[in-house]
C-alpha cells in the first residue's frame, strides 16, 4: 500500500488548482505549473484538499499513485514558496560568470564550460564562487544544479570541485610513501 499516495494535500492560500481529464494546472503567486497524470490515477479536489485514488492494485499503478501525489505536492509548494539550490565552487582559479543567457564555468579544464540557462529558472551569482538557482519547478532546479555539479565533481582527496552548499565531502587520505 502506497502511504505517499494516500496523503491528503492541502491547497495553500492564494493558490488555484484546476483539474480536467488527466491534467492538473496549479497557479500561485510565483507562477503556473502543468502536469499530465496517468488515466489509472484519479485526482479529486474537495474543500481545498487534493486526494489521489488508484483504479486497481497492480504494481505499476501503485507506483504511479505515489509519484503523482508527490509531484502534485511539489507543484503546490513550488508555486507558493518556490525552490532554491545553492552551489559552491572550491578550487584555485575556479569560478563562474553569467554571460547573457548562459553560465560560463572555469573549473580547471583547458577551456571554459558553458551551460544554457533554462528560461524557467533564475540564476544569481552573489560571488564568482557561489551560484544560487531558484524556480518553481523542483525537478528543473535540481536537474540544472546537478548538471552544474557534473562539470567538476568534488574530489575526495583535495575537496576541490563544484558542490552543493550543504554537501559534506567524505575526505580520503593520500598514499603514504614507503621506506
UniProtKB/Swiss-Prot annotation:
Write out the GO cellular component annotations. ribonucleoprotein complex; ribosome
Q: Record's superkingdom?
A: Bacteria
Give the record's keywords alphabetically. Answer: Ribonucleoprotein, Ribosomal protein, RNA-binding, rRNA-binding
Q: Name one Pfam family in it.
A: Ribosomal_L6
An example of a GO molecular function for this protein is: rRNA binding
The Gene Ontology biological process terms listed for this entry are: cytoplasmic translation
InterPro entries for the chain? Ribosomal_uL6-like, Ribosomal_uL6-like_a/b-dom_sf, Ribosomal_uL6_a/b-dom, Ribosomal_uL6_bac-type
What is said about its interaction partners and assembly?
Part of the 50S ribosomal subunit.
- Report the NCBIfam families cross-referenced here: L6_bact
State the similarity comment.
Belongs to the universal ribosomal protein uL6 family.
Per the entry, what this protein does is: This protein binds to the 23S rRNA, and is important in its secondary structure. It is located near the subunit interface in the base of the L7/L12 stalk, and near the tRNA binding site of the peptidyltransferase center.
Its protein name is: Large ribosomal subunit protein uL6
To which species is this protein native?
Answer: Metamycoplasma arthritidis (strain 158L3-1)
Amino acid at each position: 500500500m502506497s502511504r505517499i499516495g494516500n496523503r491528503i494535500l492541502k491547497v495553500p492560500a492564494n493558490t488555484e488548482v484546476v483539474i480536467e481529464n488527466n491534467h492538473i494546472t496549479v497557479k500561485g503567486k510565483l507562477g503556473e505549473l502543468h502536469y499530465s497524470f496517468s488515466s489509472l490515477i484519479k485526482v479529486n479536489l474537495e474543500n481545498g484538499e487534493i486526494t489521489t485514488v488508484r483504479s486497481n492494485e497492480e504494481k505499476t499503478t501503485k507506483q504511479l499513485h505515489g509519484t503523482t501525489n508527490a509531484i502534485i505536492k511539489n507543484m503546490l509548494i513550488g508555486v507558493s514558496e518556490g525552490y532554491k539550490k545553492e552551489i559552491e565552487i572550491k578550487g584555485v582559479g575556479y569560478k563562474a560568470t553569467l554571460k547573457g543567457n548562459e553560465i560560463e564555468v572555469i573549473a580547471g579544464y583547458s577551456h571554459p564550460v558553458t551551460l544554457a540557462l533554462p528560461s524557467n529558472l533564475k540564476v544569481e551569482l552573489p560571488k564568482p564562487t557561489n551560484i544560487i538557482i531558484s524556480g518553481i519547478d523542483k525537478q528543473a532546479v535540481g536537474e540544472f544544479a546537478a548538471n552544474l555539479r557534473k562539470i567538476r565533481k568534488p574530489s575526495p582527496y583535495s575537496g576541490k570541485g563544484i558542490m552543493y552548499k550543504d554537501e559534506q565531502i567524505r575526505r580520503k587520505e593520500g598514499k603514504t610513501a614507503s621506506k
